[in-house]
Amino acid sequence: LDRLRLPAGHAMRDVVRLENPLSEAQSTMRPTLLGSLLDAARHNVSRNGPDVAIFESGAVYRAGDARATHSLVDEHQALGALLTGALGGWASKSWRGEPGESDFFAAKALLGALLDKFHVDWSVQPATAWPFLHPGRAAEVLAGDGYGGSVSEPVLAETGMLAEGERPPASVGFVGEVHPLVAGQWDLERTAVFAIDLGKLAAAAAPVVAFKPFASVPSLRRDLAVTLPDPIAAAQVLERVREAGGEVLDDVSVFDVYTGPQVGEGMRSLALALSFRAPDRTLTEEDVEPARARIVAALGELGGELRV
């Protein structure tokens, strides 16, 4: 736990101690999968296997108030994954067209593919609760109904962000790059991980999954380049675009990012690919223009300006 840079009082230091351990090194029940993932990665890297993509599913434990109340410890099933080195053939190239790196975006993409299989609404938000993750390259994973942010349920209901019958999103885990100081403890280079609580994830999954038929008509793609302040996260931009686009917006993605003198200090340019589609007909420019105008207006509310 010291190698994970966990300060005194951190929740992950609330470990379950064994009364008769086989050795001092195995005297506690693990509070996280991260240690065993890092051990496995170092084992492979030290044996000429620099490119690692591994996962583990198993129980993790927290003591809680079990000793004081003579109750059972907090045990839950967790799933974790780790990437280091070059990504294999399973991963697509980056938006720059280069081979993928084991970075935050690769781990988030892998996590997203998994969560989509659960048919769960999910989002991420910047987080600093895990000292073993790289500051600025770490996020909390939220899953479930409602607004994707750390806002209390009463506030959500009062502001209308939480519709009737919806639940506030649950924090189910983290995703990010391992802090360089922590990775160095295991003799690893750039490394990305995620870990989620499978029990919380199952509770957040949609109880009913609706079938969406395959589209029989082509989509209409339009690209936008928008300049935004650096603090505005791409995930926030995509969320606002989806809301503004309405039913005719089939998909949106970021395919380029630019920072430099042309956009000014503290700003960056995001290039967005917008895909419009209707289920029963081929859309025209006149059909998509209202949705595009709403998207431009929504980006303006975030402080964005279109680049020509």
Segments predicted by a language model, with ranges:
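Acidic/polar loop patches that form or flank catalytic/metal-binding clefts of enzymes
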Residues: 47-55, 119-126
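Extended, well-folded interaction surfaces typified by the phenylalanyl-tRNA synthetase beta subunit core
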Residues: 1-52, 222, 275-277, 283, ...
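A structural supersecondary motif
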Residues: 54-60, 252-255
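Conserved catalytic motifs of ABC-family nucleotide-binding domains
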Residues: 81
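Mobile "lid/hinge" segments at catalytic clefts and subdomain interfaces of large enzymes
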Residues: 44, 48, 62-64, 68
